[in-house]
């Protein structure tokens, strides 16, 4: 059943994303009816303080140790929920300050903070956990909240990820582009291709920034490889890279999904800082190339969005590994840092209209699936 605010037609919807890189809450406004993207509005970024990032990391670590066994680490989860509420409310206020008269609508889509994701296995349904205090956040924002986008898909037997493909497809349709694939380079990489008949085909390809960030941070050199400098100064260990590419993951057929920590920095154990960064960067690129090879049709180009596109070493490795050109989102005329936030605004609009947000070809769910819960 449609939500009453759907009756207003296309509207300005706010979207929010806090990724597994734990660097910031991204927010964006788009004008949409859940099928088309009509206009792009203001964007905002609320970076996390060291204290906030620590709370989110502690919740993630506690979730991994718990892994749905025994009592949940509620103290750590509650501290993270408080961070999510406060930072999202501040990001929303930043959007409000940047929006013109009448550009802040009655709806917001919130992803929450993923702290644990278990993909389905034969005979075992998957599980996923995004931390959010929907009651507190809806009260803080004062608009209808769409959230919890993944659990219905997982409960129905789907992977629960990726979910951005619905929006990627709308961007490609808006541009009249049926020949490109969209590559999101977050902690994990995922790719979306839009077939000639409009069918979306999407899946996680493997790691992207996650292991690289973890490797650099583990050496006390910051939270990520700024400018790809460490990777550029290192040597790729081809023997290790070949071993990594033998992982069972690359023999699995899509759709498929990963937890951020399914591939981690331990893969480079024993290497120097620079060589480890170079090898992990090359691995992320080769994993993407292996994923592109699993698409039904080879795209004419790949459009990269997400934080990884800011890493010149990763973009160079992708250009070398892929058989087609790699463009940044900006080269395609998109706002690369805001696409995931925009995606959850788009999914919120689809949720209030009762439209699907995942399909058999994007998450492996048995049939086109609606998702998301509404509050307010």
Predicted regions and their residues:
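Glycine-rich phosphate-binding loop plus the immediately following alpha-helix
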Residues: 18, 24-30, 42-59, 140-173, ...
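Glycine-rich phosphate-binding/hydrolytic loop that grips phosphoryl groups
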Residues: 22, 282, 330-376
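Short glycine/proline- and acidic residue-enriched helix-loop micro-motifs
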Residues: 65-80, 222-228, 269-271
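Short beta-strand-loop/turn "lid" adjacent to the catalytic site in phosphate-handling enzymes
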Residues: 67-131
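Extreme N-terminal starter segment of soluble prokaryotic enzymes
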Residues: 7-14
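Glycine-rich phosphate-binding loop and adjoining helix at the ATP-binding site
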Residues: 104-165
